[in-house]
């Protein structure tokens, strides 16, 4: 693994290895032992979008492993005043050992990786969110003991979380169901990837059908535009019937896990009651961002 730009950058073996390393690092952290795996390493933390979990978990993780993490709001760099990305990338590659970038366009992230000459980690793009999905898979494995053979159902917008969960779940040997309203399908290349897995993947517009016998149900915010705008109002109409509620969850297996990448818009993609009933696994999932990202850094920079 040279970079983590999207889940399909990983082989099944590499995915399992990252989760194994994350388990080890989490156990050491809980025991008060954190090896300085990043001693002398410098990590650029580039953010073009607002962030809570991604920013803080990377800052804490780099610090815990003895590295230097520099947070940068890209709007405050010369790139925010028109400097070409290709120039910024070649500069950062001379100062840093690794870069994390939370941005909009996947192609920009790929250009940073191509031109900087250093490992690049996707902190979220409009296309993919691999660090979050690694945390999701870690949480499932902690609570169920395995991933292979379990059914994972995602309900929501077929954007970055759907794209990454589909690929990650299939790589992990899971059955994956994706439930999206018409017009909100996952990316075409992700559906082509999933097609190779045959009956292990199912795409539907029917929430009850998609949730049937699911072991894990995941969702994410699908209305992140400004309230009251035409797009926001249209999404509220398009996603009627796609809110995770206790009644809808009855289609899944008893005691199914419920995951949410956060932030949660209670009353939109998930009911307040269901969110609070499953808060333990949701906030374990948030904590595991720290541990899986440390694992990714350890694999890329410390040869773990």
Positions of predicted regions on the chain:
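Rossmann-like adenosine-cofactor binding region
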Residues: 195-273
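Glycine-rich phosphate/diphosphate-binding loop of Rossmann-like nucleotide-binding domains
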Residues: 48-60, 142-220
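Active-site cofactor/substrate anionic-group-binding motifs, chiefly glycine-
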Residues: 42-43, 47-95
């Amino acid at each position: 693994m040279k970079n983590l730009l999207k889940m399909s950058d990983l082989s099944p073996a590499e995915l399992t290895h990252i989760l194994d390393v994350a388990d080890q690092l989490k156990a050491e952290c809980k025991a008060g032992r954190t090896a300085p795996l990043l001693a002398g390493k410098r990590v650029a933390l580039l953010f073009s979008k607002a962030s809570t979990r991604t920013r803080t978990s990377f800052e804490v993780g780099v610090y815990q492993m003895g590295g230097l993490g520099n947070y940068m709001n890209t709007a405050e760099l010369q790139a925010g005043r028109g400097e070409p990305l290709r120039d910024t990338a070649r500069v950062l590659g001379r100062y840093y050992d690794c870069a994390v970038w939370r941005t909009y366009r996947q192609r920009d992230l790929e250009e940073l990786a191509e031109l900087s000459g250093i490992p690049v980690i996707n902190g979220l793009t409009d296309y993919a969110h691999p660090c979050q999905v690694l945390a999701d898979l870690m949480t499932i494995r902690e609570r169920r003991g395995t991933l292979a053979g379990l059914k994972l159902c995602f309900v929501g917008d077929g954007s970055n979380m759907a794209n990454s969960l589909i690929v990650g779940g299939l790589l992990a040997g899971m059955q994956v169901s994706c439930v999206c309203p018409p017009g909100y399908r996952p990316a075409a290349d992700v559906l082509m990837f999933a097609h190779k897995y045959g009956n292990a993947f199912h795409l539907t517009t029917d929430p009850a059908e998609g949730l049937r016998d699911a072991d894990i149900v995941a969702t994410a915010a699908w209305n992140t535009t400004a309230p009251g705008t035409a797009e926001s109002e249209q999404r509220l109409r398009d996603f009627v019937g796609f809110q995770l509620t206790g009644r809808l969850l009855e289609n899944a297996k008893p005691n199914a896990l419920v995951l949410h990448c956060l932030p949660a818009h209670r009353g939109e993609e998930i009911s307040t009651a269901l969110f609070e009933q499953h808060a333990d696994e949701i906030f374990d999932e948030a904590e595991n961002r720290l541990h899986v990202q440390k694992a990714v850094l350890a694999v890329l920079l410390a040869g773990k």
